[in-house]
Design a protein with these regions (language model features):
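Residue(s) in the substrate-gating loop at a strand-loop-helix junction
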Residues: 170
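Active-site helix of classical SDR
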Residues: 150, 186
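Rossmann-fold cofactor-recognition segment
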Residues: 73-93
């Protein structure tokens, strides 16, 4: 993890600004959302905290942590008047923006931090109607949700000729991870969307920053749902590729109190563990022959340490006059992305001649290689294209 147990929590830093800013958080009851809200409220800014009503009303640890945060807001002088809670899901984006503007007159910073993880290989996620629905839900939560709230806030920020959109992503936006294919796909889709609209909104003085946190941030601080495993992808059947399910299962299995919350299932329901010792140490929640959903039961202290670097980066970047387009949190994340880029660069160089051989060459004296298809006169291609389409060649 990016944060060791002994690493000190960094002191919050904020960019210079002339007046308090208004932040809109899309997942105000998440550990990241709560921590950012505390920091910016303490700094003197305003917070509009979006929550899903059903999640707030249940009895989960997550809802209890948010209720504890609200109690702290009431006790702390000056916080209550600068916090507004609004219902927010994929159907309520326009209403949330309107409520924020009505109460605090503007939205300066939109922080998209809504996420959940679907665990399973592509075959496991194609095995039933239920798992196919999980895939659709993954994109609804991780892609269409952020896309809709971003789309809703742009007209307001455009009218102000000012604004900053921050999207919390992960290094999985650079790195494919076995067992997290749909999680990675939804993240890559969101980053592609953000990279594109950043150019569209730049003339309106609206900035957009993608913050890529470690994979632990996105997975361990949000809801996890796993599809039933297939035996063909277990080590018992000789599957040698690393699989995120096994890594996450082992980590969750070591969390204090996990056995009390989730008693071990019968041995026949376990697919992944490869030894009797592992089976006896269960419960291996994510390897059961059923769909399993849970929030990892991390302690408050562990969670604070885990997210500290990311929260520090968010407060330092939020509302900055010249923020980065992309920020990678933590030295481990930077090293992983550098290694991926190095591999891509090496493969590019290895096959550069093959790439160049596909360029279109103009015929005639004194005519060199065209740098791209766009450099070629369309008339030079019309005959070939139409002949090919008619089956004449």
């Amino acid at each position: 993890m990016a944060n060791g147990a002994s690493a000190p929590i960094p002191t919050p830093q904020f960019p210079t600004h002339n007046a308090p800013r208004v932040w809109l958080l899309t997942s105000g009851d998440s550990p990241i959302g709560i921590s950012v809200a505390k920091q910016v409220l303490d700094h003197g800014d305003y917070v509009v905290s979006g929550i899903i009503q059903a999640d707030f009303e249940d009895e989960s640890v997550r809802s209890e942590e948010f209720k504890s945060f609200l109690s702290e807001v009431v006790r702390t002088n000056g916080w209550k008047d600068r916090l507004k809670i609004v219902p927010l899901d994929i159907r309520q984006c326009q209403a949330a923006i309107a409520e924020a503007v009505h109460v605090f007159k503007k939205v300066d910073i939109l922080f998209c931090c809504t996420s959940e993880a679907i665990i399973g290989t592509v075959e496991e996620l194609s095995a039933s109607h239920r798992t196919l629905t999980m895939v659709r839900d993954q994109f609804e939560k991780n892609f269409f949700g952020p896309m809709n709230i971003i789309k809703a806030v742009i007209p307001h920020m455009r009218a102000l000729m000012n604004g900053h959109i921050i999207v919390l992503a992960g290094i999985t936006g650079h790195l494919g991870t076995p067992g997290l294919s749909m999680y990675c796909a939804s993240g890559w889709a969101l980053e592609g969307f953000c990279d594109s609209i950043a150019y569209e909104i730049a003339p309106f003085n609206i900035k957009l920053t993608i913050v890529q946190a470690s994979v632990e941030i996105g997975i361990l601080t949000n809801k996890i749902t796993s599809a039933p495993p297939m035996k063909e992808y277990s080590r018992d059947f000789g599957h040698t590729a690393p699989n995120f399910r096994g890594l996450l299962d082992g980590l969750i299995n070591r969390l204090p109190g996990i056995r009390a919350q989730y008693p071990p299932p019968p041995e026949r329901e376990i697919q992944s563990p490869s030894s009797e010792a592992e089976r006896q140490s269960g419960p291996y929640l994510l390897s059961r022959n059923e769909v399993v959903s849970l929030y990892p039961p991390l302690s408050h202290a562990h969670t604070e340490k885990l997210i500290a670097e990311t929260v520090h980066a968010l407060t330092a970047i939020g509302g900055h006059e010249n923020p980065p387009a992309r920020h990678i949190v933590g030295v481990e994340g930077v090293a992983s992305v550098k290694e991926k880029l190095k591999t891509v660069s090496e493969e590019l160089e290895e096959f550069v001649d093959t790439s160049a051989s596909a360029d279109i060459v103009r015929q005639g004296p004194g005519v060199g290689r065209a740098s791209s298809v766009m450099d070629v006169d369309i008339k030079d291609l019309e005959g070939d294209v139409f002949d090919a389409s008619l089956g004449l060649r």
